[in-house]
Amino acid sequence: MLTLGVNIDHVATIRQARRTVEPDPLAAAVLAELGGADGITVHLREDRRHIQDRDVRLLRQTVRTHLNLEMAPTEEMISIALDIKPDYVTLVPEKREEVTTEGGIDLVSNFTRFAQVVDQLQGAGIPVSWFIDADPAQIEAASKTGAKFIELHTGKYAEALNEESRAQELESLKKGCEQALSLGLRVNAGHGLTYWNVYPVACLPGMEELNIGHSIISRAVLIGIDKAVREMKLAMRGQV
């Protein structure tokens, strides 16, 4: 059954805007789980613009579903992951000047080093997911690194300017999902998904989990996190 991972980064974004102690991402995680979240996702960025190290450590102790740690494949982040041991890690590209992650990681150009990263993390019992575009070469490379999962980048689908472009991007995601499954990879997806565009992605055969943050937190500002999560789960079933 398709599951929902709720990204709570932007709860921390609001907190860090004033460098204060609230709103607390831990409280947000609890409410998200009460609302039906199947997992909690946080991105510990190198610049610490929202989620902080302390948040990840406390979430590791309090999350009752599963904790997905998004991070760049750097030595610093690998060391943190090996210490905290999240339920799994999603490795993403990162640029300091970007507002949010802009695309999938390039495994083809950095294959040897990234395969070693997978060995390090999975050797310590931490399953690895690669955040990649629905590109056949990248999916093939992800499989060859030995990773357990991929997360397909849905940004191009979400940002498509017309229905024709959106249909083309959805077809690319469908083919990417099929290829990944044929290679023995488990498939997640995320980036830019909202209440209004999530259902077609949720219908893709073999899709395991959708990771969604900004849309849920934006809605939660108005109606509360638990209700916003419930509504997203309805949207994933085409009931919104």
Swiss-Prot record:
The active site is at 43 (proton acceptor), 70 (proton acceptor), 191 (proton donor). 1-deoxy-D-xylulose 5-phosphate binds at residues 9-10, 45, 50, 100. It catalyses: 3-amino-2-oxopropyl phosphate + 1-deoxy-D-xylulose 5-phosphate = pyridoxine 5'-phosphate + phosphate + 2 H2O + H(+). SUPFAM superfamilies: Pyridoxine 5'-phosphate synthase. Keywords: Cytoplasm, Pyridoxine biosynthesis, Transferase. GO terms for biological process: pyridoxine biosynthetic process. The keyword Transport does not apply. InterPro entries: Aldolase_TIM, PyrdxlP_synth_PdxJ, Pyridoxine-5'_phos_synth. The keyword Transferase applies. Pathway: Cofactor biosynthesis; pyridoxine 5'-phosphate biosynthesis; pyridoxine 5'-phosphate from D-erythrose 4-phosphate: step 5/5. Belongs to the PNP synthase family. PANTHER family: PYRIDOXINE 5'-PHOSPHATE SYNTHASE. Catalyzes the complicated ring closure reaction between the two acyclic compounds 1-deoxy-D-xylulose-5-phosphate (DXP) and 3-amino-2-oxopropyl phosphate (1-amino-acetone-3-phosphate or AAP) to form pyridoxine 5'-phosphate (PNP) and inorganic phosphate. NCBIfam families: pdxJ, PRK05265.1-1, PRK05265.1-3, PRK05265.1-5. This is Pyridoxine 5'-phosphate synthase. The gene is pdxJ.
